[in-house]
Curated annotation (Swiss-Prot):
UniProt keyword annotation of Iron present: no
InterPro entries found in the cross-reference section: Class_I_gatase-like (IPR029062), CobQ/CobB/MinD/ParA_Nub-bd_dom (IPR002586), CobQ_GATase1 (IPR033949), CobQ_N (IPR047045), CobQ_synth (IPR004459), GATase_3 (IPR011698), P-loop_NTPase (IPR027417)
Keywords from the named record: Cobalamin biosynthesis, Glutamine amidotransferase
Domain of life per record: Bacteria
Domain (GATase cobBQ-type) ranges: 253-441
Pathway it works in: Cofactor biosynthesis; adenosylcobalamin biosynthesis
Designated name of the protein: Cobyric acid synthase
Catalytic residues (positions): C334, H433
Recorded GO MF terms: ABC-type vitamin B12 transporter activity; catalytic activity
Top-level taxonomy: Bacteria, Pseudomonadati, Pseudomonadota, Betaproteobacteria, Rhodocyclales
Any Pfam family matching the protein: GATase_3
Species for this entry: Azoarcus sp. (strain BH72)
Length: 492
């Protein structure tokens, strides 16, 4: 397959709509019978997924694979950076941990990372009719241009055309598009075939003069203006977006809260709770009062000791004691599970200097962080009722031991037991991400938390419906013939 059948979607900013547009195009193409694969050369994200080949990739690429109706694979995201501090990250190459590097050291490593990127891209180019590539952040970050492998550096190396997407909802869309284009080199500018504007609300006729000006100013077409799709619920790539903090609902019965630590990871684990019509779910950020709740969920963390210290500084430790004293329930997932134990040891300095810290003491377990990361997709049943199906995945470097493990949270199909339940039955911990991803597990866990007779939420069905809704919008509002014709004129 010629590399001309690849198209790269770059954005004027982070959260401009790159991931969404790639997912929508992928679903639209696969519905036409086209074999298409997603690809992101380098992703920096704390939300990740486990692939069928036993590796780890960004969650956005896993979602795009679902959109393309193929199994997620490590080639879809060959370089994943998981920040562990403001100046360093865990570097994952082809799904496996390579090292923890500072920003300066990673910059020196980029030529090696680029080789991994090109190897994955070449494999995908040989297997699929089209490859839809997603950039990262903005291609016009001047300080990141040297040795760039995420945006134009990759586009130049792979010789692929580019479409620029911008979010009109945040304002300044014309300045974003024109400014980005003008900050590119002449050869990079020549790759940009045109634009897509995302999240438009209002009368398109009032926008048309601006679109005409943009085409006249740049000599490039606007391929489409995607509307603001209210209620679209797709897996977030990384940080919690505005509007995801609270989910007030009339008629909500169960109050659920979760802290937003600095290095929160895989917060998508709680999506089913945020969608549940009988759950009043709230993220609690730094400096915010900790409200009363029926259930507290401690989500995953990339830097467990540091986020545990943050919890203490924010007053969560006494709040959890009060919560349990008055009969509340607590669930800890992965890093949150580790925090609930009596001690957390990092003898190899995986998260900083080697150290051992006291946990919250809600579970009788001790955790030691080990060098080898566990990456596996699993299925099983909740031990609470022995019946509710669970389908999730493990991404962790900790090994836990202790008496409360004798009361597991989940019984896995491979014969293992996972997690722990406290002696009083109020605290549950598990290493399984995706704990709430099946309707049966949602119903059983909410029943345990106090919402008797709770209904389930089918997250997979909702995801499929929203991907089709997104693809419908792409088909209706993006001139796909013009887009792909401009990208691949020889194939038109």
């Amino acid at each position: 397959m010629s590399k001309a059948s690849a198209l790269m979607v770059q954005g004027t900013t982070s959260d401009a709509g790159k991931s969404t547009l790639v997912a929508g195009l992928a679903r639209a193409l696969v519905r036409r019978g086209v074999r298409v694969a997603p690809f992101k050369p380098q992703n920096m994200a704390l939300n990740s997924a486990v692939t069928a080949d036993g590796g780890e990739i960004g969650r956005a690429q896993a979602l795009q694979a679902v959109a393309a109706r193929i199994a997620p694979h490590t080639d879809f995201n060959p370089v994943l950076l998981k920040p562990s501090s403001d100046i360093g990250a865990q570097v994952i190459i082809h799904g496996k941990v390579m090292a923890n590097l500072s920003a300066r050291d990673y910059h020196a490593y980029k030529p090696t990372a680029m080789a991994a990127v090109m190897a994955s891209f070449d494999r995908l180019s040989a297997q699929y009719e089209h490859v839809l590539i997603e950039g990262a952040g903005s291609p016009a970050e001047i300080n990141l241009r040297d040795r760039d492998i995420a945006n134009m550096g990759f586009a130049e190396a792979a010789d692929v055309p580019v479409v620029l997407v911008a979010d009109i909802d945040r304002g300044g869309v014309f300045a974003h598009l024109v400014g980005t284009l003008e900050l590119l080199s002449p050869s990079e500018q020549a790759r940009v075939r045109g634009f897509v504007i995302n999240r438009f609300r209002g009368d398109i006729a009032l926008l048309q003069p601006g679109l005409d000006w943009l085409t006249e100013r740049t000599g490039r077409p606007v391929f489409g203006v995607l509307p603001y799709l209210h209620g679209l619920f797709l897996d977030a790539e990384d940080a919690l977006a505005n509007g995801q903090v609270a989910a007030d609902r009339d008629g909500a019965v169960l109050k659920v809260i979760a802290p937003v630590y600095p290095r929160i990871s895989n917060h998508t684990d709680l999506d089913a709770l945020r969608l549940h019509p009988q759950v009043d779910f709230r993220w609690v950020g730094p400096g915010q009062a900790i409200p009363p709740a029926d259930l507290v969920v401690l989500p995953g963390s990339k830097s467990v000791q540091a986020d545990l210290a943050w919890l203490r500084a924010q007053g969560w430790e006494p709040a959890l004691r009060r919560h349990l004293r008055y009969g509340g329930k607590v669930i800890g997932i992965c890093g949150g599970f580790q925090m609930l134990g009596s001690t957390l040891a990092d003898p190899h300095g995986l998260e900083g200097a080697p150290s051992t810290v006291a946990g919250l003491g809600a579970l009788d377990i001790e955790t030691v962080l080990e060098r080898e990361k566990q990456l596996v997709n699993v299925r099983g049943r909740l031990a609470l009722d022995g019946e509710a199906a669970v389908a999730g995945y493990e991404i962790h470097m900790g090994v836990s031991r202790g008496a409360d493990l004798d009361r597991p949270a989940v019984l896995l199909e491979d014969g293992r037991a996972d997690g722990a339940l406290s002696a009083d039955g109020q605290v549950l911990g598990t290493y399984l991400h995706g704990l709430f991803d099946t309707p049966q597990a949602v119903a059983a866990l909410l029943d345990w938390a106090g919402l008797k007779g709770a209904a389930g939420v089918d997250l997979n069905a909702r995801r499929e419906a929203d991907l089709d809704r997104l693809a419908d919008a792409v088909e209706a509002h993006v001139d796909m013939a013009a887009l792909f014709g401009a990208a691949w004129p020889d194939a038109a």
